[in-house]
Amino acid sequence: MSSQIKQVFARQILDSRGNPTVEVDVVLESGAFGRAAVPSGASTGIREALELRDGNKALFLGKSVYKAVENVNTKIAQAVKGLDALDQRLIDKTMIELDGSENKKNLGANAILGVSLATARAAASHLRKPFYRYLMDVKEYLMPVPMMNVINGGSHADNNVDMQEFMIVPAGFDTFSEALRCGTEVFHTLKKVLIADGYSVAGVGDEGGYAPDLPSNEAAIEAILKAVKEAGYEPGKHVFIALDPASSEFYKDGKYELKSENKSLTSEEMIDYYAAWVEKYPIVSIEDGLAEEDWAGWKLLTEKLGNKVQLVGDDLFVTNPSILAKGIEKGIANSILIKLNQIGTLTETFEAMAMAGQAGYTCVVSHRSGETSDTIIADLAVATCSGQIKTGSLSRSDRIAKYNQLLRIEEELGENAIYPGIKAFVFNSDEEVEEDVQEIIVEDSEAEKVVVQVEE
């Protein structure tokens, strides 16, 4: 039976914050079916592809997405009907040209992405392949090391912590399932630690982490390391720390305003702030350590810490190949966060990952703070052998769904599932890359060859 697209249908559903989002169904002539739901961010980069919302305050406080749904059911459906779902590049190119804008503002990135992902899922169903294997069919796969957001602050929580995410990284294990067990034990122990220290943990933030009112940002790290030890693990051996300050959120008039500590820091002072932490704590990754428009500061940050920790660009690069290319040229950061809805198609996502891999940058596949039960990023992380994933804490079913999908994939792959551990964190330095680092060249229907560096 044919793999041509027969039907495309979108609807409005709710995300994990109770806000409307887009869900798309795609049916092929063969009867194969694919469905995808689009996530949404809270702290968003100024150069992200546009998420189209209606703005009518009488409907969902202005957050409804009926126009995006209508765009899928009319303009996009008419344009892609009859196209071969196995030709992902053609599908995405057709929608990009139909939109005609640089940031997908006409049709909406949420409309375009929903169709892009649902089509890929339908194609995988048509070929009767697991989605990760449809994206990349090889013998061995890297399971991603999870960055688990156990203390939430900033835009993700209602507390006085400036920085957005304090994450545990269980990299000192041989399998993903062992790492996940460690993460859950540390997470539950952290609750006991916070309560014993007199903090309220009655609720959790958008990504499932605790959101206590701590006296300083550093207090979050201290609490986490205490929980790691009380759970029976060793910091720097079994569990490491990753940070996402989301510093664009507290960058005002050229200064970094840490209100919880009553500090106003220049770029150089903010870099020194991080450098002191890197010397003191087992930190392996800092995401958006400086503001997205502070490129001069980013250059200094990379020069000072780029050979010591992973420096991830999220708001900095917004999964955009053209912006990433500029960052690579200027020697800024050494890693990119991959968020599907920042760029709006599967093809462009693969292009960004390919470019990053070729430049020696790592890729961290990521969720958004407004998530759904869709598990597509779990498959994406495995398929691309990115080696790292951010999908929240160890609570809230929208986060756990991704972890459970990774457990299923690891079980299915058996001995062909490789957990890279600390080797997933490759920093740009003057040292030669070890000879056992190999390049896996991935040829798929979504994009050009994807190059991913893998250490075994």
UniProtKB/Swiss-Prot annotation:
Source organism of the structure: Francisella tularensis subsp. novicida (strain U112)
Co-factor requirement: Mg(2+)
Cellular component GO terms, alphabetical: cell surface; extracellular region; phosphopyruvate hydratase complex
Keyword Transmembrane set for record: no
Matches recorded under Gene3D superfamilies: Enolase-like C-terminal domain, Enolase-like, N-terminal domain
Keywords for the protein's UniProt record, in alphabetical order: Cytoplasm, Glycolysis, Lyase, Magnesium, Metal-binding, Secreted
Record keyword Secreted present: yes
Subunit structure: Component of the RNA degradosome, a multiprotein complex involved in RNA processing and mRNA degradation.
Name recorded for this polypeptide: Enolase
Cofactor remark: Binds a second Mg(2+) ion via substrate during catalysis.
Binding locations of (2R)-2-phosphoglycerate: Q164, K339, R368, S369, K390
Residues the record marks as active site: E207 (proton donor), K339 (proton acceptor)
Binding sites annotated in the UniProt record for Mg(2+): D244, E287, D314
Pathway this chain belongs to: Carbohydrate degradation; glycolysis; pyruvate from D-glyceraldehyde 3-phosphate: step 4/5
